[in-house]
A protein has these predicted regions:
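Conserved beta-strand positions in the central sheet of alpha/beta enzyme cores
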Residues: 37-40, 63-64, 79-82, 95-103, ...
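Short glycine-/aliphatic-rich beta-strand segments at the starts of folded cytosolic domains
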Residues: 29-43
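Catalytic domains of carbohydrate-active enzymes, especially glycoside hydrolases
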Residues: 159-175, 367
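N-terminal amphipathic alpha-helix/helix-capping segment at the start of soluble metabolic enzymes
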Residues: 1-31, 50, 75, 88, ...
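Active-site-adjacent loop and "lid" segments of alpha/beta metabolic enzymes
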Residues: 3-10, 46, 50-53, 57, ...
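N-terminal capping/lid subdomain adjacent to the active-site entrance of alpha/beta enzymes
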Residues: 39, 43, 53-151, 155-161
Length: 395
């Protein structure tokens, strides 16, 4: 007799059930083999008591704050721990409950049934994200933290675009304003001046073009000149930007940042109650704002904003638990390339962070990133290929 520990992965468990030779109906047991943990916040104590009992009756468990049983506290968060099968039983039991638990059951049901978007849809078509994509950085700026002044002449910009297209990049991200820590903002006129040639030159190629800007005037120019995606580091907090993108039906990347590039690394802007939940709440508000402006849900991309108002430790917490943001069922973009979070760990300057970048980007993809944003194109494309091969490797 031998025993083996199996990874609680849907495809892994399903494979073993089929290999064992179970009856076809018994393949549904795969639901029992994949653990599922869901945190429900701010539930009143009476409802939490019922939720805990119904969870236990469903074959799972619920952790609540001390004092809930006696109702000596008003509210608690509840950690529900089970698997797909037990959650389905819980949902049925909640359908007969009060104190808002019936509505909670409906929300849990929608969550279990929801499917991740494998396509980004927008006014010009569809971007397939069924496999990870590589976004190449083109900073037409004199002061970016890594490649400032490298691509400021028309010859250099053209050569960079030609190189990225030849190597097979999936998306080109053009930026005309540096967002490095402590950088100053510039006028939209100057930003447009910097990106104009790149937008004109890239039109000869059948290429998905993203423009990295938080200025709606720059975004308007970019969209009128071929841009497909607006990559907004301010997370669609500007009503003018939201309205513009809603009218154009472009794809939108919502990035999280506290403060502005000039002050985002100040102590006040790296403080969180809980960094994962705080960013989750930020995304929820930004997504609602976008939907209300007419931006399609499947047109959205999320970026937790590595290095934007985060300490080194916070960046790695986000990298480790990036998959938790897949609860939105939207593509995730990871912008880690050459950043100080890498240099701080390996003690290398910005020009010697390639190996660290490859490692971090691989981790990001394995933890849920659908798009990685890179300076080093060849290595970025190779990273995507290897990580995708790992993800699709089955027994």
């Amino acid at each position: 007799m031998k025993f083996y520990k199996l990874t609680p992965d849907y495809d892994r468990i399903k494979h073993e059930l089929a290999r064992i030779g179970v009856d076809s109906y018994a393949l549904n047991m795969v639901k029992k083999g994949v653990s599922l943990n869901i945190l429900v916040r701010d539930i009143k104590a009476p409802a939490a008591n019922i939720l805990k009992q119904e969870s236990i009756a469903s074959g799972m468990d619920a952790a609540v704050k001390k004092g809930v049983v006696s109702c000596s506290i008003d509210k608690t968060d509840v950690l529900l721990m089970g698997n797909t099968a037990t959650f389905e039983r819980l949902i049925k039991r909640l359908s007969m409950q009060v104190f808002g638990l019936k509505e909670l059951g409906k929300e849990l049901s929608l969550f279990l049934k929801s499917k991740e978007f494998k396509n980004i849809t927008y006014n010009k078509g569809v971007i397939d994200v069924s496999k990870p994509l590589c976004m190449g950085i083109l900073n037409t700026t004199p002061d970016s933290f890594s490649d400032g002044s490298l691509y400021v002449t028309e010859e250099a910009i053209a050569a960079r675009i030609d190189e990225m297209v030849e190597l097979g990049i999936d998306i080109v991200d053009i930026g005309g304003m540096s967002s490095r820590p402590f950088s100053e903002s510039i006028s939209s006129d100057e930003e447009i001046k910097r990106i104009k040639f790149a937008l004109d030159y890239i039109k000869q190629y059948d290429m998905i073009v993203s423009v990295d800007t938080n200025n709606y005037k720059t975004a308007e120019y970019a969209l009128n000149n071929g841009a497909d995606i607006i990559n907004d580091i301010s997370g669609m907090t500007d009503d003018n930007m939201v309205f513009l993108c809603g009218q154009s039906k472009c794809a939108v990347c919502i990035m999280h940042m506290q403060g502005s590039p000039k002050n985002m690394q100040n102590n006040a802007n790296t403080e969180y109650n809980n960094i994962i939940y705080d960013i989750h709440d930020f995304f929820t508000k930004s997504i609602d704002k976008c939907l209300n402006a007419g931006i399609g849900y499947s047109s959205l991309i999320l970026d937790v904003g590595f290095g934007f108002g985060k300490t080194v430790e916070q960046n790695y917490i986000l990298l480790k638990y990036l998959n938790e943001f897949k609860s939105f069922n939207l593509p995730l973009l990871a912008g880690i390339s050459r950043k100080s979070m890498i240099g701080a760990v390996i003690d290398k300057d910005v020009n010697n962070r390639l190996a660290g970048t490859v490692c971090a980007n691989t981790a990001a993809i394995l933890n849920g990133a659908d798009i990685i944003r890179v300076h080093d194109i060849k290595e970025g494309i190779d990273t995507v290929k290897i990580a995708d091969y790992i993800l699709k490797a089955y027994i």
